Amino acid sequence: MAKQLVFDEAARRSLERGVNAVANAVKVTLGPRGRNVVIEKKFGSPTITKDGVTVAKEVELEDKLENIGAQLLKEVASKTNDITGDGTTTATVLGQAIVKEGLRNVAAGANPLALKRGIEKAVAAAIVEIQNLAVPVEDSDAIKKVAGISANDDQVGEEIASAMDKVGKEGVITIEESKGFDTEVDVVEGMQFDKGFINPYFVTNPEKMEAVLEDAYILINEKKISNLKDLLPVLEKVAQTGRPLLIIAEDVEGEALATLVVNKLRGTLNIAAVKAPGFGDRRKEMLRDIAAVTGGEVVSEDLGHKLENTGMEMLGRAARIRITKDETTIVDGKGEQAQIDARVNAIKGELDTTDSDYAREKLQERLAKLSGGVAVIRVGAATETELKEKKHRYEDALSTARSAVEEGIVAGGGTTLLRIIPAVRKAAEGLQGDEATGARILIRALEEPARQIAVNAGEEGSVIVNAVINSDKPRYGFNAATGEYVDDMVAAGIVDPAKVTRTALQNAASIGALILTTEAIVSDKPEKPQQGGQGGGGMGGGDMGGMDF
């Protein structure tokens, strides 16, 4: 396909028009008084949302050149959302402001590369100041406020804070759709995995169809068990203790399974067998996690172990094990905390290096199971449209709460971005020429989120920005929800995670600076409408008029 090439100012202005198209649709959602955006869906009911990244992802422009600019700004929103789960609208507003102010200076003759360097140096100074202003999150009250602000709903904040209290800050919290109208929080204590009993004869409670083993031993075997001869030595040793036994293996089949069932039915041994969770290398790691939690060892040929030589010291222990047809829960495993901590640290190391969202999700699940619990928030609503929107707000609020725990909180409502302006201005004083101009571009952009929040609340943005900047109080800001000025935004519960503010600024500045230094665009040439389309239709009327298609 033929390409079109556009250069210089024309290229940059095309990108700017695309940036403006996305930003103007997204920024109306910013703040507590932000408006909704209705998104048409080809199938099903329309989506109504106040989530910036959801709006941004739906924007596709007809003009190919403008669409490139739109895609670049969408990248800002998506990347910010991937890292923190919030701050997408702030990042979009910052990106638009940097592009607008920057292109004005480029058109006036400024050196784009010098502007880019100035913006980058100003961002570095801004990030240091954000970290200085951050307050550590030490109680559930702060988490409740952060999550509540993200979702624009105090009830959401309360439920997420409650779930975090129950499972810990590292715990897994999943958001699911409820079949009813009400939202509820369920907490599963202990370590749970999605594999149930291999055979229903292992059930100890027929009414509930579950097997419960109290003060049980746990045999963790990496391979299939089918040969009774290999398993018999362990069974005899456990039988002498009179305690129950849980076998976790790739599978248990043949004469080994038949013997277990017979012994269970006769009452010789209270026993149950479940398949190991996961697949491949992930299964091996999950078995090692279970071993760490229960104080046992994985019987693995890779480690030189054989099932027939397994001693009692290699078996794990747990106070209670509950097994249903779908899942197994191990409560109060007897593993040493040092071993569990070592596994946790190893998983955190993998989390820092992985690029895959799927791998990250699975690592987070393992981390939570080791840390002692899983909470499920089941979101209820009256209609499908409301349910989708509500569930999305819960997911955003949860990500925001995690970000707050990670790097602390700062004053919200765009206040922190205004408060770091003096530090950026000081950094700009050490710069020369167009680099100093680049720093001033960022200073101007830092005002935009607070201005837009005020505009969405029906106030005069510039008046509010000036009032906050000129105040001597370090956390003085404007509460757009009530239309009042507040002496201490953090004390008033109007807060943002420092990580969200930092990430939004970094991503916006990165894309903004790239657009300023763009000198050419190469894109597909628009296709011309085919000639003679009408004539073809006329011809078809003669011979084919009676045919049905």
Swiss-Prot record:
The protein's Enzyme Commission number: 5.6.1.7
InterPro entries: Cpn60/GroEL, Cpn60/GroEL/TCP-1, GroEL-like_apical_dom_sf, GROEL-like_equatorial_sf, TCP-1-like_intermed_sf
Protein name in the entry: Chaperonin GroEL
First-tier enzyme category under EC: isomerase
Compartment(s) of residence: Cytoplasm
Role played: Together with its co-chaperonin GroES, plays an essential role in assisting protein folding. The GroEL-GroES system forms a nano-cage that allows encapsulation of the non-native substrate proteins and provides a physical environment optimized to promote and accelerate protein folding.
Keywords: ATP-binding, Chaperone, Cytoplasm, Isomerase, Nucleotide-binding
Source superkingdom: Bacteria
Gene: groEL
GO biological process: protein refolding
Predominant location: cytoplasm
